[in-house]
């Protein structure tokens, strides 16, 4: 977003610009003006401190096995009798009933009635087994094209394209957000004034079924359009050079039948953190799959209540939520999730990398968290413990919300008293702390506190004040002042989150939109400073 003007690898000659550019945006993940775009950010990073050892609920763990943002799901139920699909990614079987396959392999779908895992037969090996349905697409369809990412937002397209690893001309095609039935071509570019940026070109559809960006050059198919602009810029900011890299998506669950799993199917390998209620480990399931495992101390919560809540939690599926994979439901309870490589946002902010983060990256992280919480809001769910310690950071500054809903189940007296030593009073809305009224609006209050954690690089809220004092002062109308170097417009947003009447606080949908458009609609003149 604002600070860096690192020059990317050249992908070919530059050409004149089309007039029908849908828009462009500044980079998200550039951290330092001295960095070169061919060099991974990880070369500047010390080993992550995955989790702290404070006496709070520590988050789940998680990984994306690739160094890029998780790609969207592009497939759904079979339509029109199509039974031959093509693999979008490699997949190694995790159980005896799974089917391994390679990217590009053709598969015949035998049974797709079980939702997330389909029974398929490989047309090359003849073997049959279950496959993750979001790893395949109908053969010869637009969904099978590597450059087609379907229904992703403009903002997510920019996050993917603005990696320093990508050369000019890196591209993807997605559905248009503004015009039904139309598509958008998003292309990475570079210029000396604006640095790395993305141009968006609307692809319109002809009544006869063809496609065009400019009416003087028309194509029978999207494939033909992409092939043409890969050879000729012809008005684009740059010819198309490289398909935008994406990571394998998370499978929905570990395998077809893995939900309540035996304890001996898990191997705990590396302890990542410890809190008052348990530990977090990196481990392996079934000898095949990297996972994070949260172990809860006996007595922390009722196994019956946990299992009931987990049935709801596993249905929450969003790219900005840590995915719950499986559980061991007998005490000690184990919670198995995706493993995310950089650990908690709190430790990330306080660590070596926090020094390199500037306001554009911090606001983008906040927008991602708001996106995940907007989904929680739509699903009529409540987090109850939203703070930086319960957000996980992956590659390319991807943020995911963890530990949603667990706080409600804790039976520890020091926690359930709501003013005990283990309760996160400084993050909790007054109506929740005093009267137990936890709603999505109390989560909005907590999000405002989380914004102070971001802008202060992990400082504890209400510095110098103890919990009892915080509760008294907030009830009297005290609100934290604007953090150093933080724009007043962002502090105003925090104040909206801290309105006394919960119904007057903004929705997460509004917060997401505000933060995603922050540097175009609210702070277009932003210039990076020494800290933010």
UniProtKB/Swiss-Prot annotation:
Pfam family, one: PK_Tyr_Ser-Thr
Region annotation (Disordered) ranges: 1-52
Keyword annotations: ATP-binding, Cell membrane, Kinase, Lipoprotein, Membrane, Myristate, Nucleotide-binding, Phosphoprotein, SH2 domain, SH3 domain, Transferase, Tyrosine-protein kinase
InterPro entries: Kinase-like_dom_sf, Non-receptor_tyrosine_kinases, Prot_kinase_dom, Protein_kinase_ATP_BS, Ser-Thr/Tyr_kinase_cat_dom, SH2, SH2_dom_sf, SH3-like_dom_sf
Cited PANTHER family: TYROSINE-PROTEIN KINASE
Family classification: Belongs to the protein kinase superfamily. Tyr protein kinase family. SRC subfamily.
Protein name in the entry: Tyrosine-protein kinase Src-1
Organism in which the protein naturally occurs: Xenopus laevis (African clawed frog)
């Amino acid at each position: 977003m604002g600070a860096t003007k690192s020059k990317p690898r050249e992908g070919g000659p530059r050409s004149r610009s089309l007039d029908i550019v849908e828009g462009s945006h500044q980079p998200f993940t550039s951290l330092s003006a001295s960095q070169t775009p061919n060099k991974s950010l990880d070369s500047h990073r010390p080993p992550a401190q995955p989790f702290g050892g404070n006496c709070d609920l520590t988050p789940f763990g998680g990984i994306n096995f690739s160094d890029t943002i998780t790609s969207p799901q592009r497939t759904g139920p079979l339509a029109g009798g199509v039974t031959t699909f093509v693999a979008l990614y490699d997949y190694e079987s995790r159980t005896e009933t799974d089917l391994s396959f390679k990217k590009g392999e053709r598969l015949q779908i035998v049974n797709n009635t079980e939702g997330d895992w389909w029974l398929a037969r490989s047309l090359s090996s003849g073997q049959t087994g279950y496959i993750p349905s979001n790893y395949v697409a109908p053969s010869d369809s637009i969904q099978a094209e590597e450059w087609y990412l379907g229904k992703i937002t403009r903002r997510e397209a920019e996050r993917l394209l603005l990696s320093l690893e990508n050369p000019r001309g890196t591209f993807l095609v997605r559905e248009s957000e503004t015009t039904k039935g139309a598509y958008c071509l998003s292309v990475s570019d570079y210029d000396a004034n604006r640095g790395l940026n993305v141009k968006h070109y609307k692809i319109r559809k002809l009544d006869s079924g063809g496609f065009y960006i400019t009416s003087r050059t028309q194509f029978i198919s999207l494939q033909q359009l992409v092939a043409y602009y890969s050879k000729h810029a012809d008005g684009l900011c740059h010819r198309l050079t490289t398909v935008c890299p994406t990571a394998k998506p998370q499978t929905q669950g570990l395998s077809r039948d893995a939900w309540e799993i035996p304890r001996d199917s898990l191997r705990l390998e590396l302890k990542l953190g410890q809190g008052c209620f348990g530990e977090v480990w990196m481990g392996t399931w079934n000898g095949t799959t990297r996972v994070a495992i949260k172990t809860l101390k006996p007595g922390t919560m009722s196994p019956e209540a946990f299992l009931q809540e987990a049935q709801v939690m596993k249905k929450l599926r969003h790219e900005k939520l840590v995915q719950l994979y499986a559980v061991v439901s007998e005490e000690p309870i184990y919670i198995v999730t995706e493993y995310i490589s950089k650990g908690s946002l709190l430790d990330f902010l306080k660590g070596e990398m926090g020094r390199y983060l500037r306001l554009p990256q911090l606001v983008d992280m906040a927008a991602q968290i708001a996106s995940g919480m907007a989904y929680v809001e739509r699903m009529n769910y409540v987090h109850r413990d939203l703070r930086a310690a319960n957000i996980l950071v992956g590659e390319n500054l991807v943020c995911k919300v963890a530990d949603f809903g667990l706080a409600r189940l804790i039976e520890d007296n020091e926690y359930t008293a709501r003013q005990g030593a283990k309760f996160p009073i400084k993050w909790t809305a007054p109506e929740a702390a005093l009267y137990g009224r936890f709603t999505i609006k109390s989560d909005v209050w907590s999000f405002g506190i989380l914004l102070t954690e971001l802008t202060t690089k992990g400082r504890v809220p209400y510095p110098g004040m103890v919990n009892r004092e915080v509760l008294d002062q907030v009830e009297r109308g005290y609100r934290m002042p604007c953090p150093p170097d933080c724009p007043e417009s962002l502090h105003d947003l925090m104040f909206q989150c801290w309105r006394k009447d919960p119904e007057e606080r903004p929705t997460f949908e509004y917060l997401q939109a505000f933060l995603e458009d922050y540097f175009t609609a609210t702070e277009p003149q932003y210039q990076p400073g020494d800290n933010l």
